[in-house]
Amino acid sequence: MKRTLALIFCIFLAGCASKPSVKNLNLKSSLNYGGEELAKILEQDDAVAFSSNFREGVFIYISNAKVANYLGVVRAERHAKFSVKELGKNDFLIKSVNDLTQSFDASLERARELKCGTLVIRLKDKFQDLEAANKFLEQNESAFLKMSGEIRCK
């Protein structure tokens, strides 16, 4: 009986720990630097997608524990704002949506370096809009789950 109660309690704690602790980053709808608009930002509960004039493509900032856990990132840094330096500091270049897992596997050493830090995925293929970028996260959930066993914080 005690073992059963202990097991139920552990499952309860695991469920609480897996819930995202930050619902919103409260980001503005655009990022300005030096008087120039660099990015348009779409905020979601589990990620922030933004298109950028600074670099080509759509960036997806993994801001919440839910998506970070898909990638095996136990602790993801949460920022209230971006800087130009941060846009290119910790990113993975994915050649295409179809080659997501192969490209990521090729960058596994780089992924291990960033496993406990800020994580940005930079996609070469442009989305039609920011909504499509967020759909990308949902459609590739299985690929993220596959990666979660390979990238862990120590």
Regions found by a protein language model. Give the residues of each.
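C-terminal motif of bacterial Sec signal peptides marking the signal peptidase cleavage site
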Residues: 14-15
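Short, solvent-exposed mixed-charge patches
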Residues: 153-154
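Sec-dependent signal peptide recognition
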Residues: 2-7
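Short, linear, compositionally biased motifs with a strong N-terminal bias
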Residues: 10-11
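Conserved polar/disulfide-associated segments of primarily extracytoplasmic proteins
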Residues: 26, 41-149
